[in-house]
Amino acid sequence: MLSKSEIETNKVKFIEILKTALINRPGVRLENLIQALSSSDFFIAPASCKYHANYEGGLCAHSLNVYNNLMNILEMENDTTIDHESATIVALLHDVSKMNYYEPYYQNKKIYSENGSKYDELGKYDWKSVLAYKHKDSDKQFIYGNHEMNAEFIARCYIPLTVEESIAILHHMGGKSQDSAQDNLSEIYKKYPLALYLHLADMIATFVDENK
């Protein structure tokens, strides 16, 4: 869980990194992009409804984790062929389609503690109403294609993406995406290493950084 101050800190950090990376790219509608993110729930939304970073502010936190992981991978691999600007764009915006995608609700959940007033095979507990998230109805979502296609389209509305940037966003989920699994991922990752690096950075964030 993140505090309100941590959520705000992540928002400021995200915008600062994005501005620094895009300051010299021609054709960028940077202020429009920031306005679109700020007027949506991007900075307070979860990254998922059941799994990684499924809490308020989780989407922005996850995006920053992916950014940090991607920069670490590039440094570790000593790969100077990948442009820092491109790496920043795909890391911060690979999940941008998750803005306005989830909605909060409250569900009853067993909270186990030594002071619980009820008891089952796992121990003492009480029922408490806790914040949770679910997918919005499809008529309330932006739908262009699948998750990756939606993200690439939204990013492209504000940033003239290179081919490698588009491919990285489109294939950041690797074989976990049904659509991507039908493509020749090995050839894609060989030809466009940024796509592979982004996939690895995303998996590390999801299954390591946000699973502690």
Q: What spans do the regions from the language model cover?
A:
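Acidic/His-rich, divalent-metal-binding segments that scaffold phosphate/diphosphate chemistry
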Residues: 1-120, 125-127
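Divalent metal-dependent catalytic cores for phosphoryl transfer on phosphate-bearing substrates
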Residues: 49, 53-55, 79-211
